[in-house]
Amino acid sequence: MNFNFNKYPILSFANSVENLRLLSVEQLPQLCFELREYLLDVVSISKGHFASGLGVVEITVALHYVYNTPFDNLLWDTGHQAYPHKILTGRGEKINSIRKKNGLHSFPCREESEYDSLSVGHSSTSISAGLGMSIAAEKEGRNRKTICIIGDGAMTAGMAFEAINHAGEIQSNLLVILNDNQMSISRNVGALNKHLKILRSVQNTQKNRKKIRLLNKKLFFKDKRIQNHSISFNSIFSNLGCKYLGPFDGHNIFSIINTLKKIKNKKGTYLLHLVTKKGKGYLPAELNPIKWHTISSRDSSVSKSLSYSDVFGTWLCEIAAFDKKLIAITPAMCEGSGMVKFSRLFPNQYFDVAIAEQHAVTFAAGLAISGYKPVVSIYSTFFQRAYDQLIHDIALQKLSVLFAVDRAGIVGNDGQTHQGVFDLAYLRCIPGIVIMTPSNENECRQMLYTGYMHNKGPSVVRYPKGYGVGALLMPMNRIPIGKSLIKRRGKKIAILNFGILLHNAYCAAEKLDATLVDMRFVKPLDKSMILKLSSQNKFFITLEEGVISGGAGSAVNEFIMVNKIFLPVLNIGLPDTFIPQGTQEEIRHVYKLDSEGIYKQIFYWLRQ
C-alpha cells in the first residue's frame, strides 16, 4: 500500500527517520495526525493489533526525532504498539502485509529491520535486555543510548521488576518509558495499577504546583535537573533507585520532545511516566480498547460451531455452579480464554493475577494445598514461562491442579513467538502429569471434567485456537485415564492421532485403508492399545500438531523400543524450526498437516 501524497503529505516525506529529523518541531503534530490516519486506513483492511499503536504515535515520533536510531537502541516491550515504529522506519508501504504469510512480522523482529533492536512478542523482556545493551555500550565506550518502552500491563510481570531492581542498583545509563494506558489486553489489575492511578492523579495538580508546595512541602520537590519543574516524589520506581519523572501527557509531542532532550545525556537509570489513551484518535477503540486491541479477519460465513475457548468458559460456569471449591485463575487473558461470563457470574471464584504466569501457577499450588480445586487457564506459549513452578510447586507435591492450555498447536498470524507447538515436548517429561489432547469440542469438555476430577496430581488439557468441528456437547462423564478410541479399522497401517488433526487423519486413513486411533492421552499412553496394534499392523504413523522432537510421537517411539517392537514408525508433526506467521490453514498446508499433506507424507514414506 503506497502513501497517498495528497492525503499524507508529511508522512510521505517522513518515510524514513532521516527525513523525519528534517522536519521542524512545528510540523510534528501534523505528522502524528497523518500517521494515526494511515494506521486507521491500513489496519482496518489488513487486520492486526490496532488500539495499542494508536496510543503511542506521539511517543514513537518523539523518540525517533530525538534519538539517533538505529545506532541508539529502541526496545518495544511485547510489540503490540510497534506499528507506528515500523511505518517510520521504512516499512510503511508494506504494513498491509503485517501478520500475513511472508509479510511483516507482527512484532519487532531483528531479522526484519536494523531498527528493531530486540525481537519480542512476549511481555516484560525489554528492561532486562535493555540493561544488557546499556552495559555493553558502556564497556565499549560508545555513547549509545538505550530506551525501553513498556506498558503498564507488562510492568506487572515479575521479570520487569527483577530488571528494575538490578538497574536501580547499578545505575547504568538506561531510559525506561512507562506507557501508562491502564490496559494490557484486558484492563489492568493489582496493587501496581492502583499505585499508577495515584501517580496519574498528580497530572491534575501540576497546574497548581505552587499552591501544592505551600500546602505540603514534603510531598513534592523541585528536580533542578529538569527545567520544566516536573514533579518527583516517593514512587515505587524512585524507591527502587530509578530517577522517576512524570506523569506527563503522552500525547503532547512538544512536552515529550522537550523532556527527552533534557534527559538524553544524563547519567543513570531514568523512568519517564507517560499517560496515554489506548485507541487514541478512533472513538470506538477509545471507548472499548479490549474489543479493538486486535482486528481479526472475518469469514464470509459465520461458524455455527463453538470455539474451544467458549467450550472451556461454558464448562467452567457449569462446574462452579455446584462446586464452590473451584477457583479459576488467568494471567491477564480473561477475554481470550473465554472467561468473561464466568468472571461476572462467579467473581469470588475468579482471579486475574495480571501478566504473572509464574505467580499464577504457584498461587494455584497454595490453593490446592488448602483444599481448593484450582483451574489455571493459560496460553500454551505463555505456559512455558512458568515451567519451574509447574515442576517444583505442583508436580513434585502431586497437587491436583487442572491446566486448561489454550492456543495449543498452530496459532497463526502472531507468528513464531506465539505458536503453541512446544507444550507436549516440555510437559511430557514431568513425572505424574496427565496430558490430554481433545480431537473435538465434546472431547475437550469431557477431558476438562476428567482433569478436574483427577486427584493424583496435575492434569493438562491442551486445545487449539479457533472453532471446533461442530461436535454435539454431551453430559459430563469421566474418561478412563490413558484409554484411546479406535475411530476406523483398516489393514497394515495404524495411524495414532493426538489431538485436533483427527479429521484430517480420517481423510488420509480412508485413502490408505488404515486403522485410525484417537489416542486422547499423551501421558499416560494407552500402552495396551499400542501393543495390540503392533501385532496387527506393519507400519505405525503418529500424528500431532506440535514439534516432533520430544512430542507425542517420541513417546510412542520410546515405548516400542523398550518393548522390542520392531516395526517402522513415521512421526508426523512440526519440524525442528520456529513456525512463522500465516493463517492456521496456510501453515498446516505448508507443513503438510492438512488431509492431503498427511496422506502424501504417508504414501511417499511407504513407497521408500
From Swiss-Prot:
Give the EC number: 2.2.1.7
Q: Name one GO molecular function term.
A: thiamine pyrophosphate binding
User: Keyword annotations for this protein?
Assistant: Isoprene biosynthesis, Magnesium, Metal-binding, Thiamine biosynthesis, Thiamine pyrophosphate, Transferase
Provide the cofactor list for this protein: Mg(2+); thiamine diphosphate
The cross-references to Gene3D superfamilies, in alphabetical order and at most eight, read: 3.40.50.920, 3.40.50.970
One GO biological-process annotation of the entry reads: terpenoid biosynthetic process
Q: Does the keyword Mitochondrion apply?
A: no
- Keyword Transferase on this protein? yes
Which residues does the annotation say bind Mg(2+)? Answer: 152, 181
Residues holding thiamine diphosphate:
80, 121-123, 153-154, 181, 282, 357
Q: In which pathway does it act?
A: Metabolic intermediate biosynthesis; 1-deoxy-D-xylulose 5-phosphate biosynthesis; 1-deoxy-D-xylulose 5-phosphate from D-glyceraldehyde 3-phosphate and pyruvate: step 1/1
Q: Where is the signal peptide?
A: none
Q: What are the disulphide bonds in this sequence?
A: none
Question: What reaction is this protein's catalytic activity?
Answer: D-glyceraldehyde 3-phosphate + pyruvate + H(+) = 1-deoxy-D-xylulose 5-phosphate + CO2
InterPro entries for this protein = Dxylulose-5-P_synthase (IPR005477), THDP-binding (IPR029061), Transketo_C/PFOR_II (IPR009014), Transketolase-like_Pyr-bd (IPR005475), Transketolase_BS (IPR020826), Transketolase_C (IPR033248)
Comment on bound cofactor? Binds 1 Mg(2+) ion per subunit.
PANTHER family xref list: 1-D-DEOXYXYLULOSE 5-PHOSPHATE SYNTHASE-RELATED (PTHR43322), 1-DEOXY-D-XYLULOSE-5-PHOSPHATE SYNTHASE, CHLOROPLASTIC (PTHR43322:SF5)
How is the subunit organization of this protein annotated in UniProt?
Answer: Homodimer.
- Name the family: Belongs to the transketolase family. DXPS subfamily.
Job description of the protein: Catalyzes the acyloin condensation reaction between C atoms 2 and 3 of pyruvate and glyceraldehyde 3-phosphate to yield 1-deoxy-D-xylulose-5-phosphate (DXP).
The record, for NCBIfam families, names: dxs, PRK05444.2-2
Q: What is this protein called?
A: 1-deoxy-D-xylulose-5-phosphate synthase
Organism of origin is Buchnera aphidicola subsp. Acyrthosiphon pisum (strain Tuc7)
